[in-house]
Amino acid sequence: IMPVYPKIPHRDYRTTFELLTKIYKRLLTKIDKPENLVIIGDSAGGQIALAFAQMLKKEQLSQPGHIVLISPVLDATFKNPESRKYEKEDPMLGIDGSKYLVELWAGDTPLDDYKMSPMNGDLEGLGHITLTVGTKETLYPDAVKFSHMLNDKGIKHQFIPGYNLFHIYPLFPIPERQRFLEQLKKIIVTKEL
């Protein structure tokens, strides 16, 4: 299932989370094992995927077995000073433009709230996390920080840096895409990190 979620400027995250919650609850009635569900999100969708999994936990709904984050926005405040250094090499994302869009998405919700900055949320008890991000993108420093946070908390995850690659590189028809997809398939099928 690939939901087309409501977007800014006409809607904010609340409408999207309501839609995703309805879809997810319906899915839970149709499957035997929630651990067979995989949530995948790229860019803002990666932010949504992780924040949504955290919301599911708060609502005491079953976790998906796997959460795949492709170049996710993990900290919508964009306060990491390292990000500015990477911004110079990022052909797709600028911090100021990204922050403006996140502010529209957030509405009156603070940018450091886990729904906007999921690395600030409760990371315990979520589905297995696989994270990939290009090393030439603005979001790379936060992805490294997030991976270290997960390591420090003893949370199993897979971090797959896309060396010398750009934002959402697995969506482009390049050889690195195929390598990532093969790794991802192995991780999801074997359930080993």
Outline where the language-model segments fall.
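Alpha/beta-hydrolase superfamily serine-hydrolase fold, recognizing
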Residues: 1-193
